[in-house]
């Protein structure tokens, strides 16, 4: 039986979002209609996240809610796919017999067949966007070859596999023609792009060719600090449509912890990388991510992390408590920092970053900048600068005045005020 009305719930990161969008395009080609709500559908498909405990719990909660709908007769069928299934397929099958099928992260044809749809190789480049139409993500690789001790992604997604450049360019053309203005380049590790196929980094070559397509903004996310091709920073400085922004998760600075994490980099090398990137492009904004409460992290080691963050003054920073993941190598270590202490350390680090962010945002006050509008409501426009990625970074809150502003438009704005994580101002012109 072909599923005519399907509700797809996509959980987790932007990589998962791309997987869902690819599936949607294939299914729509077979006549399947996607609904806005579960109540309109006869089938539910949940694309799960299984990266950390909170994500697992959210996925389980959504599956159980969908099972209730099936038991009530609201829907006829229920399927589950994605990272959680990749890790716990057998356990899920045993505990959730009401689910009609479980699929991993590399079973797109099988999922489509279960839904009553056909897989078409020629449609692989096509996606039905779940993001607003003016920005999206380009996933340039699958899997990961790194062996970070805290991470289960290699088990979930497999070894690193760069997507063919020509396929990525075809996909990018389709996205550009659909109206996408901001292209966010992602994978588990963009630094390694090309190493598995060409024996060297091909990231800069790809970025140059994407830049030639005249996207308004191209942004780099998920760069690993080891093997990052520094020529990309020079290209960023030279090409106006490549955002002066780099997301490069460092996770920690203490040498003992970095070694235990198997990050392949030490504190001094991290500092040198930061300094080199900033020297090559003084206008760049750096985003990073830190982990607090890694097994054995002492108060002194955490204080060292605080000092590192204060000294290097990252433009954007996220911090997460260490999660003791069953399928990560660090699960063999004793998880000896209490949950309460982990949360306290996260809060302390983010309080420090709040002060850094406030200082950096204050520098924008009185200046005129270009903003991409994401949302408009009741005389206010909400958008981002080139220094802010969707969903995770700062937001600009702008009074529109007499200007007719719509999502997806670029505008000139004057910044009049700021908070640690927002800029406030007014629209003074349209681009």
From Swiss-Prot:
Domain TRAM stretches: 362-429
Higher taxonomy: Bacteria, Pseudomonadati, Chlorobiota, Chlorobiia, Chlorobiales
Name of the molecule in the record: Ribosomal protein uS12 methylthiotransferase RimO
Gene Ontology molecular function, alphabetical: 4 iron, 4 sulfur cluster binding; aspartic acid methylthiotransferase activity; metal ion binding; protein methylthiotransferase activity
Species name: Pelodictyon phaeoclathratiforme (strain DSM 5477 / BU-1)
Residues given in the record as [4Fe-4S] cluster 2 binding sites: 144, 148, 151
Chain's gene name: rimO
Function, in words: Catalyzes the methylthiolation of an aspartic acid residue of ribosomal protein uS12.
Subcellular location(s) per record: Cytoplasm
The keyword Electron transport is annotated on this UniProt entry: no
Coiled-coil stretches noted in the UniProt entry, renumbered to this chain: none
InterPro entries from the UniProt entry: Elp3/MiaA/NifB-like_rSAM, Methylthiotransferase, Methylthiotransferase_CS, Methylthiotransferase_N, Methylthiotransferase_N_sf, NA-bd_OB-fold, Ribosomal_uS12_MeSTrfase_RimO, rSAM
Pfam families linked to this entry: Radical_SAM, TRAM_2, UPF0004
Leading EC class: transferase
Keyword field: 4Fe-4S, Cytoplasm, Iron, Iron-sulfur, Metal-binding, S-adenosyl-L-methionine, Transferase
Cofactor: [4Fe-4S] cluster
Major localisation: cytoplasm
EC assignment: 2.8.4.4
Comment on bound cofactor: Binds 2 [4Fe-4S] clusters. One cluster is coordinated with 3 cysteines and an exchangeable S-adenosyl-L-methionine.
Residues binding [4Fe-4S] cluster 1, per UniProt: 13, 49, 83
Reactions this protein catalyses: L-aspartate(89)-[ribosomal protein uS12]-hydrogen + (sulfur carrier)-SH + AH2 + 2 S-adenosyl-L-methionine = 3-methylsulfanyl-L-aspartate(89)-[ribosomal protein uS12]-hydrogen + (sulfur carrier)-H + 5'-deoxyadenosine + L-methionine + A + S-adenosyl-L-homocysteine + 2 H(+)
Ranges where the MTTase N-terminal domain occurs: 4-120
Keyword hit for Glycosyltransferase: no
GO terms under cellular component: cytosol
GO biological process annotation, one example: tRNA modification
Domain Radical SAM core: 130-359
């Amino acid at each position: 039986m072909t599923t005519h009305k399907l509700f797809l719930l996509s959980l987790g990161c932007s990589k998962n979002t791309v997987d869902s969008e690819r599936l949607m395009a294939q299914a729509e080609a077979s006549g399947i209609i996607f609904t806005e709500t579960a109540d309109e559908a006869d089938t539910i498909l949940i694309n799960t996240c299984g990266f950390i405990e909170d994500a697992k719990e959210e996925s389980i909660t959504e599956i159980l809610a969908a099972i209730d709908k099936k038991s009530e007769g609201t829907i006829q069928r229920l399927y589950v796919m994605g990272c959680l299934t990749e890790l716990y397929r057998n356990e899920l099958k045993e505990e959730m017999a009401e689910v009609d099928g479980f699929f991993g992260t590399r079973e797109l044809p099988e999922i489509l067949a279960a839904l009553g749809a056909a897989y078409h190789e020629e449609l692989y480049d096509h996606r039905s966007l779940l993001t607003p139409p003016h920005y999206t993500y380009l996933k340039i690789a699958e899997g990961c070859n790194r062996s970070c001790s805290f991470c289960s992604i290699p088990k979930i997604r497999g070894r690193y596999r760069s997507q063919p450049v020509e396929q990525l360019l075809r996909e990018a053309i389709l996205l550009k023609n659909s109206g996408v203005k901001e292209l966010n380049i992602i994978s588990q590790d963009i630094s390694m792009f090309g190493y598995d196929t060409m024996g060297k980094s091909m990231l800069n070559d790809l970025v140059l060719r994407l830049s030639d397509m005249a996207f308004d903004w191209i942004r780099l996310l998920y760069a690993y600090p080891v093997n990052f091709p520094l020529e990309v920073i020079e290209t960023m400085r030279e090409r106006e449509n490549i955002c002066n922004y780099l997301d490069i998760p460092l996770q920690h600075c203490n040498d003992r912890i970095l070694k235990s994490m198997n990050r392949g980099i030490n504190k001094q090398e991290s500092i040198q990388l930061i300094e080199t990137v900033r020297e090559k492009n003084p206008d760049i904004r750096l985003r990073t991510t830190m982990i607090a409460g890694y097994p054995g992290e002492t108060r002194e080691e955490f204080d060292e992390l605080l000092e590192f963050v204060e000294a290097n003054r990252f433009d954007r920073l996220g911090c997460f408590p260490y999660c003791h993941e069953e399928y990560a190598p660090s699960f063999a270590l004793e998880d000896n920092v209490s949950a309460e202490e982990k949360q306290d350390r996260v809060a302390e680090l983010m309080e420090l970053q709040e002060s850094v962010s406030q200082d950096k945002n204050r520098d924008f006050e009185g200046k005129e900048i270009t903003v991409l509008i994401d949302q408009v409501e009741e005389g206010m426009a909400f958008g981002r600068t080139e220094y802010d990625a969707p969903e995770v970074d700062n937001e600009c809150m702008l009074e529109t005045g007499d200007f007719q502003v719509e999502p997806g438009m670029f505008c000139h704005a004057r910044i009049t005020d700021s908070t640690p994580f927002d800029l406030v101002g007014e629209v003074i012109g349209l681009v």
